[in-house]
């Protein structure tokens, strides 16, 4: 494993066009549960399965139940960026990292100092009215009770992509641009099972595809470098 980390270190040292594509595993070391891990949200007992609650149709039909789940399970106070977030921000400041493309909704990349962050699934730190689209601070949702209402009478919702909803076209287009033009593409902390987001990596045309994940993924067989370690540990060594 030390040899593989050394190879990754050399790749990073020799490139100024790195793109990072990350998932829930990037934030687990900050105390945010991974949806699909053994201890993740999808394995915790609830009245409805989490994937049902986090769907557009459920939100429309049972907003009270959705917000109860949202405040109890998605809003986690006191979380801070970990070693992976901080090192990625450093690489951007050094002019090496061009973009962070994340499936996470926690805002920890920005908290670490990263500036060019493409949030495929939105952010729990933003909110807007589902009727008039007026923007709101997420505190209206996260620190409130019941179903938050806009002055127009519409329901205020978090600026996240729920199941059954499409990804933002502009964010996807920018992500494709960065992946397609990357010299080094590092994929970290994701099982690559969430589509359409996971399909974006197919746009990579280079020969330095790196996978950093605790467990195996469907892309391990054609990656140029695979490291099965905690992502914070790996990034602290590059």
Each predicted region: which residue ranges?
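Conserved catalytic core of sirtuin-type NAD+-dependent deacylases
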Residues: 1-238
């Amino acid at each position: 494993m030390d040899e593989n980390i050394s190879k990754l270190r050399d790749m990073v040292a020799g490139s100024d066009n790195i793109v990072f594509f990350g998932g829930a595993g990037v934030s687990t070391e900050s105390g945010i549960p991974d949806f699909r891990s053994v201890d993740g949200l999808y394995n915790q007992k609830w009245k409805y399965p989490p994937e049902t609650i986090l769907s557009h149709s459920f939100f429309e039909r049972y907003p009270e139940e959705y917000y109860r789940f949202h405040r109890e399970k998605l809003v986690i106070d006191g979380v801070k960026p970990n070693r992976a977030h901080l090192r990625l921000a450093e690489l951007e400041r050094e002019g090496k990292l061009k973009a962070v493309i994340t499936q996470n909704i926690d805002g920890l990349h920005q908290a670490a100092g990263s500036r060019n962050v493409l949030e495929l699934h939105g952010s729990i730190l933003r909110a807007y009215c589902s009727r008039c689209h007026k923007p709101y601070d997420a505190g209206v949702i996260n620190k409130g009770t019941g179903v938050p209402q806009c002055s127009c009478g519409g329901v205020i919702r978090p600026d996240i992509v729920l199941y059954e909803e499409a990804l933002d076209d502009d964010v996807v287009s920018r992500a494709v641009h960065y992946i397609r033009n990357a010299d080094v593409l590092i994929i970290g902390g994701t099982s690559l099972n969430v589509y359409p987001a996971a399909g974006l990596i197919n746009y990579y045309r280079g020969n330095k595809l790196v996978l950093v994940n605790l467990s195996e993924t469907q892309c391990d067989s054609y990656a140029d470098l695979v490291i099965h370690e905690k992502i914070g540990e790996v990034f602290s060594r590059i």
